A protein has these predicted regions:
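Short, flexible loop segments at boundaries between secondary-structure elements
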Residues: 522-545, 582-588, 642-677
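Local cysteine-cluster metal-coordination motifs and their immediate loop/turn environment
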Residues: 281-296, 342-356, 432-436, 465-477, ...
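Ferredoxin-type iron-sulfur electron-transfer modules and their immediate structural context
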Residues: 213-341, 715, 720
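Alpha-helical membrane-embedded segments
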Residues: 21-28, 127, 161-162, 196-232
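Membrane-interface segments at loop-to-transmembrane junctions
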Residues: 48-49, 71-76, 108-118, 142-162, ...
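Juxtamembrane/interface segments at transmembrane-helix termini
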Residues: 29-47, 99-102, 132-153, 169-180, ...
Length: 725
C-alpha cells in the first residue's frame, strides 16, 4: 500500500501539501513561542542558573515523573496517561511526516519492532487519558469547573483523540506486527482498510496536529512548552523565603546604608523577575491553587490562579509597548487589584500544590513592597483594611512590637522564673511579641521555660533587648523596617553570643531560622519548642506525654508546610486521636499570616471555614475567643477631622528628596500626623474609652513620643534638607 505522501491529490503531490501545512503551522507556532519568550525576558534579573544537580532532580521528579500531578489521584492519573503517552507518540509524528523514512532508514532493524510497540503504547495511553478526562469534564464535572467555559479544553482533548485513532488506522494499513502492535493488528483484522481510508486517516491525522500547533500558543496548553523551563528554574531557596531588597556579590543582603535602588518592589510588568513571568505561560489552569487558597475560600478578592492569568493577559495586551521599552498606563498592580494584593496570607499553599512550580506569593509580596515603601497610598477599596496595619508598622518602628507596648515591659512575663536575662546561655528562648505581651501566649512561654529547666538545660531570654523578628513587617511589604529589626536583633545575638535559639512562634521560627541567614545569621541554630521537647523526650530527659480526651492538632503553615516539621508537635503531645480533614502539608491556613492579623477583617467567614474543618471530624464543639481589633482610627479621624488631615498632607513636598530620604520622610510624616491626630482625639473622654488599653495611649506616652520623633526627624533632615512642619 502506498504511503499517503506518495499519492497525488488533484495533481498536487502529497509532499507539497504537507510542506505547506507544516510551514504555516510550524511558522505560527514558532512565532508565538518566540514572542512569549521575548516578553518573559523583559523581566528583572534573577539568578536561577545555580544548583544544577538539584534542578535536574526536580525536573526528573516533577516534570518527567509527574510527582505533584499525582497528588490529585483522579486528575493525576488521567494527566499522566496523556503526558507519558504524548512523549512516546511524539516521535511517530516525525516518522509519519517523513514518509516512514525515520523508522526505515535510521532505526536499526532489531529495534524497529520495539519502537513500534512503544509508539502504540503511547497512542493507547494518551487515548485512554483523553477519554477519561472528557468524561470527567462532561459527565462528572468537578465543582471548580462548573459554570466555566470548557470549550477550549474539550476541543484539545478531541484533537488528541483524533490523532490517536487515526494513527491506529494508518498503522493497520502498514501491515502491523501483532506481537508489538496489537491494536493496529486488531483494526486490520476487524475492518477493511483500503488505500483511500489510509489516505483520509493520514490527512486527518496531520490536520489535527497542525490545528493543535495553532491552538497551543493561544491557549492554556502553552504549558506544554513552558512547564519544563518553569520546573527547571524553580526556586532552590527554602519555601516562603523572601529575597532581600539587594544582595552583594556574595549573596548577602546589602545593609540599609548601602542600598542603591531606584524603586522598591514591583508595580510594572518588567519589575517582576523573568522567572516570575514564565509562570503566566506555564499555568495549566488546574485550579489547585484556587482550591487551597484561604483568601479565596473566605470570599475575598484574591484568586491565585487569576493572578497568574493576569500576568499573561497583561503581557499580551501591552506587548507592543513593552517590547518598545515603554511602560503602559496600567501597571501590573492595577491588573491584580489592590484588594487581591492585600488579601494574601502568604501561607504558600498555592505554591506547594502547583504541579509546575508556579510561584504565586512573590508577585503579591513584591507588589506590597511597592505599595508600602514607594507609594504609601492605597486604593479606597482597601483603605479601611490597611490603615490598622499602618498603625502596627508604626508600633514596630517605635516599640519593636505590633501592640505598641513599651519595650521595657517585654520581659515581664518571666519576672518570677529565675531565668537568665540578656546573658550568655546554651539556649536562648526567643519569646516573640505574642508570648511577651498576650496573656494567653505568656503561659506558653512560661511553660516552655519550665520544661527546659526541668530537663536541666542552660536557658536564658533576651528580655527588653529582644525585638520583633520582623515577620509582619516583611510580609506587609515594609522591607526597610524588617531589615532594621533583623540587623538590630542580630547585633544583640552577637553581643550576647547566641548560638541556639528556641521559639514557640512558627513565624519567628521561620524568620529567625531561614530569612536571617541573608543578613548574617548563618551560624545560629533555630528550633521550634516542639522539636526541642520531642528531642528531650527521646533522650529520656522528659517523661512521655499523656493526655485525656479526644485531641487534634492544627499544623501552622510556617511550621508544617513551610518549615517541613509535621511529626515533632504531634510526638510532643503524645500523638493526636483524630486528624482534621486538612492536616500536614495540606493544613488549612488560620488566616492570620501575611500580616492579616493586623488588618481590618470585614468578614468572619475565614474563621468559620477553619473551624468547620475541625468540627467535621466529630470533635466536641470548637470554641474560640477572638480579641477585638481596634477600628481604623486614622480612617475614622479622616472623617472627623478632614481639615486637620488635609492641612498635614499639604505640609510636605517630597519630590526634591532622594529615594532613601523620601521613604524616611513618608514614615516620619505619617508618624507625626498620627501623633497630632490622636492627641486631639484623646481630649474626648468618650473616644479614650474606645481605645484598647494595651496600646498604652496615655498622655505621658504621647509627650515622650512627640519628643522622640522630633529628635529623630531633626537628626535625619539636618543632613540635606530642612523640613518645616
Amino acid at each position: 500500500m502506498q504511503h499517503p505522501l506518495d499519492v497525488s491529490y488533484a495533481g498536487i503531490s502529497g509532499w507539497y501539501i504537507l510542506l505547506v501545512l507544516g510551514a504555516v503551522s510550524i511558522g505560527f507556532f514558532t512565532y508565538q513561542v518566540q514572542k512569549a519568550t521575548r516578553l518573559v525576558l523583559l523581566g528583572a534579573k534573577d539568578n536561577r542558573f545555580d544548583s544544577w544537580g538539584a534542578r535536574l532532580k526536580e525536573t526528573a521528579s516533577v516534570w518527567l515523573g509527574q510527582r505533584k500531578v499525582l497528588e490529585d489521584p483522579v486528575a493525576g492519573v488521567m494527566h499522566v496517561l496523556m503526558f507519558w503517552g504524548f512523549l512516546m507518540l511524539s516521535t511517530d509524528m516525525f516518522d509519519l511526516a517523513s514518509g516512514n523514512r525515520f523508522s526505515e532508514h535510521l532505526l536499526p532493524e532489531a529495534i524497529n519492532p520495539l519502537w513500534n510497540g512503544m509508539v502504540e503504547l503511547g497512542y493507547t495511553s494518551a487515548l485512554i487519558g483523553c477519554f477519561l478526562a472528557l468524561n470527567r469534564r462532561v459527565l462528572f464535572t468537578p465543582e471548580k469547573l462548573k459554570g466555566k467555559s470548557q470549550l477550549e479544553g474539550n476541543v484539545i482533548l478531541l484533537l488528541i483523540m483524533t490523532i490517536c485513532t487515526t494513527a491506529f488506522v494508518i498503522e493497520a494499513g502498514e501491515g502491523p506486527d501483532p506481537t508489538y502492535e496489537m491494536i493496529g493488528a486488531w483494526v486490520a483484522e476487524t475492518f477493511t482498510i483500503t488505500q483511500s481510508i489510509v489516505n483520509w486517516a493520514y490527512w486527518a491525522h496531520m490536520l489535527a496536529i497542525c490545528t493543535f500547533m495553532f491552538l497551543i500558543p493561544l491557549s492554556k496548553h502553552m504549558h506544554l512548552v513552558m512547564a519544563l523551563p518553569n520546573v527547571f528554574f524553580f526556586d532552590t531557596q527554602p519555601m516562603a523565603k523572601m529575597r532581600p531588597l539587594q544582595v552583594d556579590e556574595n549573596g548577602t543582603a546589602v545593609s540599609l546604608d548601602d542600598l542603591d535602588l531606584e524603586t522598591f518592589g514591583a508595580s510594572q510588568y518588567t519589575q517582576l523577575s523573568w522567572r516570575s513571568l514564565i509562570d503566566g505561560w506555564a499555568c495549566t489552569s488546574c485550579a489547585r491553587c484556587q482550591d487551597v487558597c484561604p483568601a479565596y475560600a473566605s470570599g475575598k478578592d484574591l484568586n491565585p490562579m487569576q493572578i497568574i492569568h493576569d500576568v499573561r493577559s497583561y503581557a499580551n495586551e501591552h506587548s507592543q509597548l513593552l517590547m518598545k521599552g515603554e511602560a503602559p498606563e496600567e501597571d501590573i498592580i492595577s491588573r491584580f487589584g489592590e484588594s487581591a494584593v492585600w488579601a494574601c496570607t502568604t501561607c504558600n499553599a498555592c505554591v506547594d500544590v502547583c504541579p509546575v512550580n508556579i510561584e504565586h506569593v512573590p508577585k503579591l509580596t513584591d507588589a506590597r513592597r511597592h505599595l508600602m515603601m514607594e507609594r504609601m497610598e492605597f486604593d479606597e477599596s482597601v483603605e479601611d483594611t490597611v490603615m490598622p496595619l499602618m498603625m502596627t508598622i508604626e508600633n514596630l518602628e517605635s516599640d519593636s512590637n505590633p501592640y505598641g507596648i513599651p519595650m521595657h515591659e517585654r520581659g515581664d512575663w518571666a519576672a518570677d522564673l529565675d531565668v537568665k536575662v540578656a546573658e550568655p546561655a546554651e539556649y536562648i528562648y526567643f519569646a516573640g511579641c505574642a508570648a511577651s505581651f498576650d496573656e494567653r501566649n505568656k503561659k506558653v512561654a512560661r511553660d516552655t521555660i519550665s520544661i527546659m529547666k526541668e530537663a536541666g538545660l542552660d536557658v536564658g531570654i533576651l528580655g527588653m533587648q529582644e525585638g520583633c523578628s520582623g515577620d509582619a513587617a516583611r510580609r506587609a511589604g515594609h522591607e526597610y523596617l524588617f531589615q532594621m529589626l533583623a540587623e538590630t536583633n542580630l547585633a544583640t545575638f552577637e553581643e550576647i553570643g547566641v548560638k541556639k535559639i528556641v521559639s514557640s512562634c512558627p513565624h519567628c521560627f521561620h524568620t529567625l531560622g531561614t530569612e536571617y541567614k541573608d543578613f548574617g545569621g548563618q551560624d545560629i541554630e533555630v528550633m521550634h519548642h516542639s522539636q526541642l521537647i520531642n528531642h528531650l523526650q527521646d533522650e529520656g530527659k522528659l517523661p512521655e506525654p499523656k493526655h485525656d480526651g479526644k485531641i487534634t492538632y492544627h499544623d501552622p503553615c510556617y511550621l508544617g508546610r513551610i518549615g517541613g516539621e509535621l511529626e515533632a508537635p504531634r510526638a510532643a503531645i503524645g500523638g493526636v486521636d483524630v486528624e482534621t480533614e486538612n492536616h500536614g502539608r495540606g493544613s488549612f491556613c488560620c488566616g492570620a499570616g501575611g500580616a492579616q492579623m493586623w488588618m481590618e477583617e470585614h468578614s468572619m467567614k475565614d474563621t468559620t471555614v477553619s473551624i468547620s474543618f475541625a468540627q467535621r471530624n466529630w470533635l466536641q464543639p470548637v470554641q474560640t475567643q477572638l480579641p477585638l481589633v481596634a477600628r481604623s482610627v486614622l480612617l475614622w479621624l479622616q472623617m472627623a477631622y478632614p481639615q486637620l488631615v488635609q492641612r498635614w498632607k499639604s505640609k510636605i513636598s517630597l519630590k526634591s528628596f532622594g529615594n532613601k530620604s523620601r521613604q524616611m520622610m513618608l514614615r516620619l510624616r505619617q508618624q507625626r500626623l498620627r501623633l497630632e491626630l490622636l492627641s486631639s482625639m484623646l481630649q474626648h473622654k468618650c473616644i479614650r474609652q474606645l481605645l484598647p488599653c494595651h496600646l498604652h495611649f496615655q498622655r505621658r506616652s504621647w509627650l515622650e513620643s512627640h519628643q522622640w520623633y522630633n529628635r529623630r526627624l531633626s537628626r535625619h533632615t539636618s543632613r540635606k534638607h530642612l523640613l518645616r512642619l
